Amino acid sequence: MASLSLAPVNIFKAGADEERAETARLTSFIGAIAIGDLVKSTLGPKGMDKILLSSGRDASLMVTNDGATILKNIGVDNPAAKVLVDMSRVQDDEVGDGTTSVTVLAAELLREAESLIAKKIHPQTIIAGWREATKAAREALLSSAVDHGSDEVKFRQDLMNIAGTTLSSKLLTHHKDHFTKLAVEAVLRLKGSGNLEAIHIIKKLGGSLADSYLDEGFLLDKKIGVNQPKRIENAKILIANTGMDTDKIKIFGSRVRVDSTAKVAEIEHAEKEKMKEKVERILKHGINCFINRQLIYNYPEQLFGAAGVMAIEHADFAGVERLALVTGGEIASTFDHPELVKLGSCKLIEEVMIGEDKLIHFSGVALGEACTIVLRGATQQILDEAERSLHDALCVLAQTVKDSRTVYGGGCSEMLMAHAVTQLANRTPGKEAVAMESYAKALRMLPTIIADNAGYDSADLVAQLRAAHSEGNTTAGLDMREGTIGDMAILGITESFQVKRQVLLSAAEAAEVILRVDNIIKAAPRKRVPDHHPC
């Protein structure tokens, strides 16, 4: 009996698209590797910057070497590339640094996987080998971690080293010592809480980056109203988000017909009376400072001035939220029950000058650890990149305060993990050993890229570094100032254990997810249905 051959049947809707097996895998690999190649030139202390230009009505220019910022601002269509972009964003949210490293490591793992699949090694065999390699690498990283949490002097030095290492690959590298000190002082003021909301960063054009400073207290980028006190001691602050243009019902497009101008004056008088009534309800709280998220308008401002109350209007939402946190108050919107409203407090409110701008300074706030870092710089792009760099350093330091374990940087940790994985591969029979070797090779690519970006002979340096670790020199790493192999413990090139651990685990998981893909199915685009019932 002749066998029937079934013709392939398309089960998808018209317009849907499917990529299978090798085609799907190749699409994923190409997209992920392209993302890694895009950001790898920014890796390390001598990494390059990217200029990001956006078009359209809100056209802007951004100069950065922050991996998460670059990936966040580029549009990607490849699904595997989107996985790496999301992973980089999570790395930024979780620990604040290592966004470029995690993307490059995942891309290098997939580059190795591509060559293994070309040798007919099954993806599941590769994944099994990678999982064992990840376990060995994590154990090697854990065993190399140093904890100085119980020694205050050594721990502070660790924080200085970590901040210096983080900032060395950023725009702030030329003012590294200055900003390292600022970041460490700001984080130590938090007293272990790790609440970065208490650290406010203000950017002001003018001067140079070296003119940036840490201010103990809170700065609000607003001006005090006309004819109001410019300085208040022992302030009681009511923070509000309320409309001061009376509580009238606004009827848009309505008209009022009157037979004389006296009637118009009566309407204005009635509105003023409602405003006055609201101001009186606010004053019953026994305050001497009123800060509103919305506009206050001239007449209520006059009333506050006559009562000797400082009134600040149109404070931005983030500023109001942070001010409520640091002064210990709550944001109110109704004022009928003064006993239920929690007021903020501080020892002194005064107007200060920074450059050519006036700001309001709150000192002696209820949240003692609150502080403001004022950034100065020649252009807005420099200030924006300085803020991103400083934010990364603050995030890493906050993580280190929670988990005080540290590891060595300069490619030392990657080489240490690669050495442990290679030793495991030598003891493992079968094809899984080949997958482990590829994992170790991907780890060794990170110091290779760091050396390449600095313009040194990466093959020679990485070979020397590998030999040093094979001989048991577990603190050897790349000294990019001299272009040689150095002792990371002596040079003080230290990184947070949590950052390195997160880079390792996230990259391995993302690479595994992409490697498992054997089909990419794109849904049919939605068709616009014509409107048969026009208005």
UniProtKB/Swiss-Prot annotation:
Residues the record lists as binding ATP: 44, 98-100, 495, 500
Modified residues (Phosphoserine): 3, 60, 260
Biological processes per GO annotation: binding of sperm to zona pellucida; chaperone mediated protein folding independent of cofactor; chaperone-mediated protein complex assembly; chaperone-mediated protein folding; positive regulation of protein localization to Cajal body; positive regulation of telomerase RNA localization to Cajal body; positive regulation of telomere maintenance via telomerase; protein folding
Gene3D superfamilies assigned: GroEL (3.50.7.10), GroEL-like equatorial domain (1.10.560.10), TCP-1-like chaperonin intermediate domain (3.30.260.10)
Top EC category: hydrolase
Binding site for ADP: 44, 98-101, 168-169, 410, 495, 500
Name the record gives this protein: T-complex protein 1 subunit beta
Organism: Homo sapiens (Human)
Lineage: Eukaryota, Metazoa, Chordata, Craniata, Vertebrata
